[in-house]
Amino acid sequence: MKVLAVIPARWASTRFPGKPLKEICGKAMIHWVWDQTIQAKSVTQTVIATDDDRIAEYCRANDLDVVMTADSHPTGSDRLAEVAQKIEADVYLNVQGDEPLIEPATIDAVTDCLVAAMERGIEVATAYIEGATDAQLDDPSVVHLVPALDGSVITFSRLPVPYPMAETMQRSVHVGLYAFSRAALLRFPELERGPVERAESIEVMRYLEHGHRIACVPVEPGSIGVDTPEDLVEVE
């Protein structure tokens, strides 16, 4: 089974332009993500997908495989689908380019989750961390995931769901790492972006809004997503 890890990287970011090439301890952030990803035992091949010449030049200069994509993709997974048209694989991983501390074990866990889920007819998988901190509950940049008893996803939200009306329940934090079957990924850009995806800016909601199931697996905390210059300082 060929597992292709794709790291989407774009220059244009509202809150932090050019962040893929921002240095962390002397090395570009995208390079840190690459180094973590290639350590995953499940990954057969890794590529960086970008629409920016500056990022592509850095990759080529540092022997990181890069694929140029269109600049019109609304999400990283849409960009991934273009890569899938160019490189064939059985499983595609969307490894966020702003997760320099992503654990290889997390990547392997999501891959294994998808492989098992495909036997149940589920073609997309992701991960979550059990137990949100107080700071995460108040942070709209944090996405929360509500898991079902059967290991699938009920919903995602930037609100700290579920609301504890009757009793307290532990909230979970979504880890922005996705695994797709080839068929599911190629289908992704053909699906209309629904109102919840647009409102919450959570790309994987597109599958749920169209009635498709998503498998999920709990993983250990450890990674820090870089959305702002302050996050970069925290990672260092």
Residue ranges and their predicted role:
Residues 2-49:
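N-terminal glycine-rich phosphate-binding loop and ensuing alpha1 helix
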Residues 5, 46-48, 92, 124-125, ...:
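Hydrophobic/aromatic residues located in beta-strands of well-ordered beta-sheets
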Residues 21, 145-147, 216:
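A structural signal for short hydrophobic beta-strand segments in well-ordered beta-sheet cores
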Residues 43, 89, 119-122, 212:
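Short, high-confidence coil segments that cap the C-terminus of an alpha-helix
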Residues 47, 53-112:
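Short phosphate-binding loop-to-helix
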Residues 102-194:
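Conserved core of the sugar-phosphate nucleotidyltransferase
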Residues 169-236:
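Conserved alpha/beta core of the MobA/IspD/sugar-nucleotide pyrophosphorylase nucleotidyltransferase superfamily
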